Design a protein with these regions (language model features):
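Iron-sulfur-associated redox domains of electron-transfer enzymes in respiratory
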Residues: 2, 9, 13, 17, ...
Length: 221
């Protein structure tokens, strides 16, 4: 080509200086964080579950709602400690079965023969009968609904269940605390299914509630 020297060579640029390579990471320099998985171990029941029933008499169903209000506690109770075998509001069972613990809600209407018969049947078929809530234990406001008034000849008489049958435990209050209901059920389980040490623990917890039942309806719920 015109104007180009055939003997001239293209200019060669020097290679760029490479940075110093970083040394490889040694295994000893690597910190591995170990994940520790914490597993909460569920205590296994000591024996087979107990059976629990709920007899509804003259009450507002607030006590049964309290039992359901335990939520996770109720599921744990039913999974590990007790089978609910009778409760007309929750279980489709028409006749009172044999059971370990019967929770009786509401006072007993003396003029309702069916209520009186069901209460007596529950007493015969349960090992532990519990006056569940203020109405069953003391009558509460239903005690003022007594018959015999001349101006109200149709008014019915309502009494605490202890005036009809023998009661083993009282769980007072209106309504009872959900935790108290759950505790009583677990302690009844230990009392009926546990070893000697567990039975002593359950007896110590349940004794005040047994003493309330022995005193009868002299207190106010």
């Amino acid at each position: 080509m015109p104007g180009r020297n055939p003997e001239s060579k293209p200019e060669v640029k020097p290679a760029a200086i490479r940075p110093h390579a970083k040394p490889a990471v040694k295994p000893s320099d690597v910190i591995v964080e170990e994940k520790v998985e914490v597993v909460q171990k569920e205590e296994k029941p000591v024996a087979e579950k107990i059976t629990i029933g709920e007899l509804h008499l003259s009450g507002c169903t607030g006590c049964l709602v309290t039992l359901a209000d335990t939520y996770e506690g109720l599921f744990k109770l039913l999974d590990n400690y007790a089978d609910l075998v009778y409760a007309l509001t929750l279980v489709d069972v028409r006749h009172v079965p044999e059971m370990d613990v019967c929770l009786v809600e509401g006072s007993c209407c003396l003029d309702d023969k069916l209520s009186v018969e069901e209460l007596k049947e529950a007493r015969e078929k349960s090992k532990v009968l519990v006056a569940y809530g203020g109405c069953a234990a003391y009558g509460n406001i239903t005690r003022f609904c007594r018959g015999g008034q001349w101006n109200q000849p149709g008014q019915e008489a309502f009494v605490p269940i202890s005036e009809v049958v023998d009661v083993d435990l009282y769980i007072p209050s209106c309504p009872p605390c959900p935790q108290e209901v759950r505790n009583v059920a677990v302690m009844a389980y230990l009392l009926l299914r546990g070893n000697e040490e567990q039975k002593k623990l359950a007896t110590a917890y349940l004794t005040p509630l047994m003493q309330l039942a022995q005193r009868g309806n002299e207190a106010c719920g």
